[in-house]
Each structure stands twice: as C-alpha cells, then as structure tokens.
Amino acid sequence: MLKYLIKFYPKILFIIEGTLVTLKYSIIAVILGLVIGMLLAICKVNKNCVLRLFANFYTSIFRGTPLLVQLSIIYFAAPYIISIKFSVFMAGVISFALNSGAYVSEVIRAGINTIDKGQFEAAEALAIPKFLIMKDIILPQAINNIFPSLVNELINLIKESAIISMLGEMDLMRRAQIVSIETYNYFFPMLIAACCYYILVMLISFIAKIIEKKMIVN
C-alpha cells in the first residue's frame, strides 16, 4: 500500500488540488443563494399576494426539478433562449445559486415564522419602517435560529457540486475520473476524492459548531 501511495503521489496531489475548485463553486453559490433566499423569504411573508405567488412558484420550480437538469438548461439551452453563452464556471455558479436560493428561502421563512410577532408589532408601533424591522430585528434572530440548516445547505452544495464535472470542470470528481482513466484503476482515485469530500464536510461541521456555540453565548 505504501509503495502504491509513493508511486501515485503526483496523481494524488492532482486530485486534491480539485478541492479548491469545489470550494470555490460551493462558497460563491451559497453566498448568492443566501441573498436570493432572503429576498424570496421576505416575499413569502409579505402581504402582497403577487410577491408571494412569485416566490412560491420560483421555489416549486427549483425544488421540483433535478439540479443536473437546471445546470444543463443554463449551459446548453441558454444560448438558444437568451442568446448568451455562459462559461462553465458561470453556468455552475448560477445554477447552484438559483437552486440553493429556493431551499434557503424555505429555511429562512421558517426561521422568520419562529420569531414572536409581538416584536414586529412593537416595532411598527414605534413607527420603525418595515424594511428596518426586517433587516435589524427579524432577520438577525431568524439567521441565528437557522444557522445549522444553512451549514447543511453549504455541505449539500459541496457534495452536489460534483455534477459540474459533467461539463469538464476540473473539480475533485473530474480529476479523479481523469486519473482513473489514465491508471485503469477506478477504486483508488475515487477513494481519494471521497476522502477529500469527507474531510471538507467534517472540517466545515467542526467550524460551524464552534461558531454556533459562540452565537449561543452571545
């Protein structure tokens, strides 16, 4: 086993380098997804029925169709529909962010609904604008309540980002596939990729627990 590791050390490094690509997609997508999710969640709790219908329709579309289909439409069909050819990176980030936003919106909506309505009514009685009530009072509390769920969404994105290899992006999965073809050995490269994904997830979970404890103390 040791001789095998030494022999394939350069290829192991080649696979591990894909971790940065996977992280890049996941972090950017989850940040954009959080922004989209917040906007959708605000629409869902809004009294305007048009905004609620739009937000619910958006969520149903992106939760009701596979991420792979969404990625394929954005990358392959966009040039024919809107005459724009997205790069692999842009197509990946857009599809991941739009998909993540749908799930995050439901999480944030649930978090907003857990906040005592009396706080909103008290703020309105003080003539505080609704935008500031949501931004400074409701959302900060909701985010604290749903932090573990947001971390789970980041973890899901890290694992689901493997489908970007379908478009030839040199992420963890794609690099493992290349090494598998070159060495005629599928088990070892895929094992290395699986270990990288696992370490990433465990590391994020560990950091999230530390942050969560500090949030509880504060």
UniProtKB/Swiss-Prot annotation:
PROSITE patterns the UniProt entry points to: ABC_TM1
A GO biological process held by the record: amino acid transport
Pfam family, one: BPD_transp_1
Entry keyword annotation includes ATP-binding: no
Keywords recorded for this protein, A-Z: Amino-acid transport, Cell inner membrane, Cell membrane, Membrane, Transmembrane, Transmembrane helix, Transport
Subcellular location: Cell inner membrane
Signal sequence residues: none
Any one of the GO CC terms: ATP-binding cassette (ABC) transporter complex
GO molecular function terms attached to this record: transmembrane transporter activity
Membrane topology: Multi-pass membrane protein
Transmembrane segments: 25-45, 57-79, 86-108, 187-207
Gene3D superfamilies (alphabetical): MetI-like (1.10.3720.10)
Function: Part of the binding-protein-dependent transport system for glutamine; probably responsible for the translocation of the substrate across the membrane.
Family statement drawn from the similarity comment of this UniProt entry: Belongs to the binding-protein-dependent transport system permease family. HisMQ subfamily.
Name of the protein in its database record: Putative glutamine transport system permease protein GlnP
